[in-house]
Amino acid sequence: MSKLWGGRFTEEAEAWVEEFGASISFDQQLVNQDINGSMAHVTMLAKQGIVTQEEAEKIKIGLQYLLKEAKENKLQFSVEAEDIHLNIEKMLIEQIGEVGGKLHTGRSRNDQVATDMHLYLKEKVEHIIKATKQLQTVLVHQAENNIETIMPGYTHLQRAQPISFAHHILAYFWMLERDVNRYEDSLKRINISPLGAGALAGTTFPIDREYSAELLGFNGIYENSLDAVSDRDFILEFLSNSSMLMMHLSRFCEELILWSSQEFQFIEMSDQYATGSSIMPQKKNPDMAELIRGKTGRVYGNLFSLLTVMKGLPLAYNKDLQEDKEGMFDTVKTVEGCLHIMAGMLETMTVNKEKMGQAVTQDFSNATEIADYLANKGLPFRQAHEIVGKLVLYCTQKGIYLLDVSLETYKEMSSLFEEDLYEVLSPYAAVKRRNSAGGTGFEQIKNALEKAKGLTKEVIKG
C-alpha cells in the first residue's frame, strides 16, 4: 500500500518495521475525537474560503458516515495506514474520492493528534469527576448511618483515641474533594485547542484557529505553535491527579482489608466484592480492595513512564510522543473501574458496630481524656501526661483498664481526681466532648455532613 506521505521515499519499509511504528492498535480509541476534530477543521476551511462549500459538504458527509460506522464498530483499521489519522483519511478518500485529500490542508498530524487527546481527556476527566462525586455520596450515606458508631482512632496503627466511624469515613470524603478540585482545575489547561498549529510553525493558509476551537467547545487556543504540538503537560497532570486519587483509594482499601480480617472484624465485605480460596473452604478474601490497592502502582507507573519519555525531548514533535497514549488510556480505564468498584464495595459492606465498640472499651485510648481532665483542673499538661502514663503502666501490670481503677488509687496519683472522672472515661463521652472545629464530636460531624451534602447535592438529585 502506498503511504499518504510516501512521495519522498523510494523503498518500502519491512512489514515488521511498519508494525513496530504503527499505533493504530491503541490510538483507534481516538476515532470519535479524530473525526469530530476533522469536521471542525473542514468547516473552518470552508468559512475561510480555503476549500469550497461544496467540497466541505462532501467531506463532512463522508466523515459523518465514518463516524456512524465507528459507533457501530464497523470500521476496519489497517497497520499499513499506521495511525488513526491516516486510517480515517484513507477511508475518507476511498469513500468520497480525491477531494477527501483536501481535508488535511493547513493541518499536520502533530496538531491533529494533540487535538484528539485534548478532546478525549476533556470528556474522560468530566466522567471521572462525576464518578468520584458518586463515590462521595456513598461515603456521606455511610457516615450518616454511623455518626454514633464509636471506633478506635489510630496512629502508628496503634489505638490512639476513640473517634466516630463517621468521622473516619468523612476524612476520605475530603480527600476525594481535593481530587475533584484538582481534576476540575486541570480542565482549564485541557480545554484549549492546538488545532491549526501545524507541524510546528503554523501554516501559510489563512486559517481561523479561534473558530475551529469554538466549534470543538474549547475555551481558547495555544498561543505558541511549538508549544501546542509538543505539550503533554495536560496528560502528565491527568496522570498525576489520577495517581493522587488512586493513592487515596489505596489507603482506604488497606484499612478495609485490615478491618475485614479476623483480627479486627470491624466490617464484613459483601459476597459480591469478595472471593474464596481454591483450597481453604473457610476463606472470604477482600480481593476487590486488594486489586484497587495493587492497581495504584500501575497508575503511578504510567505517570513515571511519561515523565521519563518527556524529560529529554527537544522541541517540537518527536516520535517518542507516541508513547503518551497507552498509559493515558490505561489510567482512564483503571481509575473509572476502581471508582465504580469502590462505590459498590462501600455501599454494600456491613459495619460491625459491636466489635468497634468493644475495641474502645478494652484498651487505653481514653488515656488522653484523663490528661485533659487534669489539665482542665489547672495542672500543666506535661505533668498530667506523666501521671496518666504511670496509671497506664499500673493498669498493664495489673491486667486491668482505666475504667477498672478505683477512685482511691486515682487519688493516690493526684488529689485533683474526683468522682466525675468516670464520666469522661466513657468512649461515647470522649467522642462527644471533642467538639472543636473539624473534630470527631457529634455536632461537628453533623456540620461536616451538611457541608458534604452541599458539595454532592447535584449528584444526589441525579
From Swiss-Prot:
Highest rank taxon of the organism: Bacteria
Entry EC no(s): 4.3.2.1
GO biological process: arginine biosynthetic process via ornithine; L-arginine biosynthetic process
Disulphide bridges: none
GO molecular function (one): argininosuccinate lyase activity
Pathway: Amino-acid biosynthesis; L-arginine biosynthesis; L-arginine from L-ornithine and carbamoyl phosphate: step 3/3
Cellular compartment(s): Cytoplasm
GO cellular component: cytosol
Main subcellular location of this protein, as a coarse class: cytoplasm
UniProt-listed CDD domains: Argininosuccinate_lyase (cd01359)
Keyword Cytoplasm applies: yes
Sequence similarity: Belongs to the lyase 1 family. Argininosuccinate lyase subfamily.
Stated name of the protein: Argininosuccinate lyase
